Swiss-Prot record:
Its EC number is 1.1.1.408. Substrate binds at H140, T141, K277, R295. It comes from the Bacteria. Its cofactor is a divalent metal cation. This is Putative D-threonate 4-phosphate dehydrogenase.
């Protein structure tokens, strides 16, 4: 029996670097040692990506995951030929590309909900292309949340063992500050802890970052820590959660990277993004927690400016596949 986890990998926007990085990642034999990769995309686009990148691989279009060979040298592919190859252009925002990317995601979700794949790893998509296709989502997390019926799924970054959650994401900084409430922080402490346990961590140590310089120095310059964050942390501790904070944001991520904490709850988008990407930009992986299955993703965009040149690095996608494979077994046991 093959015990390697079966990972469904979406090709991403077909006009982007997604097909090229998929080709490069699946040319790496290490990926096949870790998992059984199943690409979900378009065989015609992938054939073009093979030419562009110069990789020597065979395509094996399949109707179901059970038909895959999962051996290095052959790319098993759920084939969804929904784009017009005559009009598809590298590096351009196109409605048909946005619609195709959404179709790949939707099929990956169906396979995961059926239990046909153990986890999903996603390639890059473009928000403008989704909008052009009249698909009313701003990103992967929202799509996965809606199509799985999951309430407010969590985003977690993993960068070489450093794990970061986000209390707020795609809102203005002013709005993010207004959203830092006792109830929201407490809810996220509970849910982040549950997510870490689902990944196999036992009694995980969670640190909550502060908002203001030096955590506001007891209200001298900003009172969000005293008014909202500290009461939430104290309530969570009373409930038995292994949480501490608020910790100064200029040092808490370093302490987590050194192993003092299992994860950090950052308070707004750039607070966590800067920490992760400065630590290792290419190896930052996004994980969506709070879904019925595990989802990992590259943490970069479609890079239209270099699409079709063969220059795009597959490091982030390879790392996303590795992380998905690493956590798949533990996630399956706790589901």
């Amino acid at each position: 029996m093959d015990t390697r986890p079966l990972i469904g990998i979406t090709m991403g926007d077909p006009a982007s670097i997604g097909p090229e990085i998929a080709a490069k990642a699946l040319a790496n034999p290490e990926i096949y040692a870790l998992c059984r990769p199943l690409l979900i995309g378009d065989s015609r686009v992938m054939a073009r990506a093979f030419e562009t990148t110069g990789v020597k691989l065979n395509l094996n279009p399949v109707a179901t995951p059970a038909e895959g060979k999962y051996a290095h040298g052959t790319v098993d592919l759920i084939d969804l030929p929904v784009v017009d190859m005559g009009t598809l252009q590298w590096g351009q925002v196109q409605a048909q590309a946005g619609a195709a990317a959404f179709a790949y995601i939707k099929r990956s979700i169906e396979l995961a909900l059926e239990g046909a794949v153990d986890a999903v790893t996603t390639g890059p998509i473009n928000k403008e292309a989704l909008k052009a296709a009249r698909i009313d989502f701003i990103g992967h997390t929202e799509i996965f949340g809606e199509l799985t019926g999951s309430h407010d799924p969590l985003t977690m970054f993993e960068t070489k063992g450093l794990r970061i959650f986000f209390l707020t994401r795609h809102v203005s900084l002013a709005q993010a500050c207004r959203m830092i409430t006792r109830d929201r922080v407490l809810d996220y402490i509970r849910r982040c802890t549950a997510a870490l346990e689902q990944l196999g961590l036992v009694r995980p140590k969670l640190a909550v970052a502060g908002l203001n310089p030096h955590c506001g120095e007891h209200g001298l310059f900003g009172d969000e820590e005293v008014r909202e964050i500290e009461p939430a942390v104290q309530q969570a501790q009373a409930e038995g959660y292994n949480v501490s904070g608020p910790h100064p944001a200029d040092s808490v991520f370093w302490h987590a990277a050194q192993g003092r904490f299992d994860a950090v709850l950052s308070l707004y988008h750039d607070q966590g993004h800067i920490a992760a990407k400065m630590y290792d930009f290419e190896r930052t992986v996004s994980i969506t927690a709070g879904l019925p299955f595990l989802r990992s993703s590259v943490d970069h965009g479609t890079a239209f400016d270099i699409a079709g040149t063969g220059r795009a690095s597959a490091v982030s996608l390879e790392e996303a596949i590795r992380v998905g494979a690493k956590y798949a077994a533990a996630f399956r046991r706790t589901r």
